Every structure is written in C-alpha cells, then in structure tokens.
C-alpha cells in the first residue's frame, strides 16, 4: 500500500511528465494508493499561487474534477494519532542531526500511522523518518 507524495501525484500534470513515473502510476491498483490531506493542501496551494489564466484554470479543473475524485475515501487526515507520530519523528531526527521539513514530516507520520510506503522523489526526509520509501524515478 502506497502513500503518494506531492511530487509523484503532480508529475502527470507537468507539461513533459517523466514517462517512467507515469507508467508506474498507471500500473498501480488504485485501491492500494492513498494521498495525505497535506499533499492535497500542497496541490491546491500550488494551483492557487499560479497567475489567473488558462493554465491555472486547466490545472484547477484537472485536480478537482479528475485527480482528487480518484482518491475519494483514500485521503488520509492529519489527526491526533498522526500528530503524536509527527512529534516523535521530528524530535528524533533533530536530536540525531537530521532535518525533516514540516510537510514531509506530516506525510511521513501519516505513512507510519497507516503502515504505508511513501512514493517520492525526495527520499531524504522519509529515510530520516524511518518510513518505507519508493522512488519511481529510479527504483
């Protein structure tokens, strides 16, 4: 079971997406793939920060009408149990000289709570958080 990081789920939206990543996404059994609420927030923020125009409108529509509906019932919240894991992950990393970005920590904690592998290109924070990681660009 897989939790997609923002850079993975957004890859097909790029003007020239990585073919390997797109093929990997297409090979997945959708019911085994999840998003975190944090990833949804990052995706929506990315669209909101674009200048008004056709690109913003197209990306907004693709996100809200095509991508997010695919994950209905499989968008995992940042709740109290995940918050407790987040605090453990970030404090452990910090006391051991490792840095985990806040958003990556939220996503890592969500993965840990639900025993999921994180699919991401940015593996460092997730390795530091001691969660299972898969990089569809290289693995």
Curated annotation (Swiss-Prot):
Domain PINc: 2-123
Binding positions (Mg(2+)): 5, 104
One Gene Ontology biological process: migration in host
Keyword entries, A-Z: DNA-binding, Hydrolase, Magnesium, Metal-binding, Nuclease, Toxin-antitoxin system
UniProt-listed Enzyme Commission number(s): 3.1.-.-
Pfam family of the protein (one): PIN
Cofactor: Mg(2+)
Keyword Chaperone: no
Enzyme class: hydrolase
Disruption phenotype: Disruption of the fitAB locus leads to faster transepithelial cell trafficking of the bacterium; mutants adhere to and invade cells normally. Mutants grow normally in liquid culture but much faster within human cell lines A431 and T84; these latter 2 phenotypes were observed using MS11A bacteria with a disrupted fitAB locus.
GO MF term list: DNA binding; magnesium ion binding; RNA nuclease activity
Purpose: Toxic component of a type II toxin-antitoxin (TA) system. Plays a role in the speed with which bacteria traverse human epithelial cells; disruption of the locus increases the speed of trafficking about 2-4-fold. FitAB binds to its own promoter better than FitA alone. The expected nuclease activity was not observed for the FitAB complex, perhaps because FitA (the antitoxin) prevents metal binding and thus catalysis by FitB.
Subunit structure: Forms a heterodimer with FitA, 4 FitAB heterodimers form a complex that binds to promoter DNA. The complex is also seen in solution. This protein does not actually contact DNA.
Family: Belongs to the PINc/VapC protein family.
HAMAP family for the chain: VapC_Nob1
Name of the protein this chain belongs to: Toxin FitB
Lineage: Bacteria, Pseudomonadati, Pseudomonadota, Betaproteobacteria, Neisseriales
Gene name as annotated: fitB
